[in-house]
Amino acid sequence: MKKIVFTGGGTVGHVTLNLLLMPKFIEDGWEVHYIGDKRGIEHQEILKSGLDVTFHSIATGKLRRYFSWQNMLDVFKVGWGIVQSLFIMLRLRPQTLFSKGGFVSVPPVIAARVSGVPVFIHESDLSMGLANKIAYKFATKMYSTFEQASSLSKVEHVGAVTKVSDQKNPEPDELVDIQTHFNHKLPTVLFVGGSAGARVFNQLVTDHKKELTERYNIINLTGDSSLNELSQNLFRVDYVTDLYQPLLELADIVVTRGGANTIFELLAIAKLHVIVPLGREASRGDQIENAAYFVKKGYAEDLQESDLTLDSLEEKLSHLLSHKEDYQAKMKASKELKSLADFYQLLKKDLS
């Protein structure tokens, strides 16, 4: 039986594509393994998926671009993770390793290359993260979401592989209940802050609940169960799974962070959106670059977190609603999306 090892973690964005691909390989008779951190979100997501995947936990260390005494300890953690991954590779003898990035992926990638296992990696952002910059040196091939990343010799631009489609789904009962609290004459705004929510969105909704719900139906994915609420023109919930796409379909506009997975999902369904990227003080600036790219393409509006107020947000929302057809036409004309089936066939071809 052919074997494939997946790796990637730290955030949901570093796991999502793996979760989409693994069932395909299982259906085709592959034995699927995953290397990650049992304390990480990658382990939680695999357990929730119920997939027949063998999980191997290794030591991990965070990769930092700045000086920290913690770096010294993490060097040893990464080194031990490489040794652990090497033993896993030598024991399994897989046909390939597929990495979605994140600091947990570096030891398996290095170990795979050392043991002669072909390495395929995927980069979602406009500029590579530190983990993928290291992994690229050991990779057989890298697939990129953005065109600008394709100047490197081992990179193939494939566009975004998204988990949503523009196909309408039957409304779940929970959504019907939510809509009974909404005013259908008002536009619906969905705040999405990633897997852990976004405090800045939560605070904005909390501080301006009255003004917002007078003008919009508000859906706020908070990441914080203490904020859960269903009231007139307002639905706040910490986390959703099956309800995620129906909520996207219900929304007229989405206010989101600038993670590549989320904004390309919105592009796939031509959904109006305002991107409020994480600033450079909280990230390496990849979300700012992603947002600027989408604005340049005419897909979205952006708003820096430092400039986010009720007035500035309403200005962006009003502009999008007034120019809805223009934005949607540009999104629908985009050639930057690839279906899961097409990407899977491409990957299998490269593995052969």
From Swiss-Prot:
EC class of the enzyme, as a word: transferase
Keyword Protein biosynthesis belongs to the record: no
Similarity section: Belongs to the glycosyltransferase 28 family. MurG subfamily.
Name of the protein in its database record: UDP-N-acetylglucosamine--N-acetylmuramyl-(pentapeptide) pyrophosphoryl-undecaprenol N-acetylglucosamine transferase
Alphabetical keyword list: Cell cycle, Cell division, Cell membrane, Cell shape, Cell wall biogenesis/degradation, Glycosyltransferase, Membrane, Peptidoglycan synthesis, Transferase
Function: Cell wall formation. Catalyzes the transfer of a GlcNAc subunit on undecaprenyl-pyrophosphoryl-MurNAc-pentapeptide (lipid intermediate I) to form undecaprenyl-pyrophosphoryl-MurNAc-(pentapeptide)GlcNAc (lipid intermediate II).
Functional pathway: Cell wall biogenesis; peptidoglycan biosynthesis
GO molecular function: undecaprenyldiphospho-muramoylpentapeptide beta-N-acetylglucosaminyltransferase activity
CDD domains xref list: GT28_MurG
One Pfam family in the UniProt entry: Glyco_transf_28
Organism: Streptococcus pneumoniae (strain JJA)
Membrane topology category: Peripheral membrane protein
Superkingdom field: Bacteria
Disulfide pattern: none
Catalysed reaction equations from the record: Mur2Ac(oyl-L-Ala-gamma-D-Glu-L-Lys-D-Ala-D-Ala)-di-trans,octa-cis-undecaprenyl diphosphate + UDP-N-acetyl-alpha-D-glucosamine = beta-D-GlcNAc-(1->4)-Mur2Ac(oyl-L-Ala-gamma-D-Glu-L-Lys-D-Ala-D-Ala)-di-trans,octa-cis-undecaprenyl diphosphate + UDP + H(+)
A cellular component term, taken from the record's GO annotations: plasma membrane
Gene3D superfamilies, alphabetized: Glycogen Phosphorylase B (3.40.50.2000)
EC number: 2.4.1.227
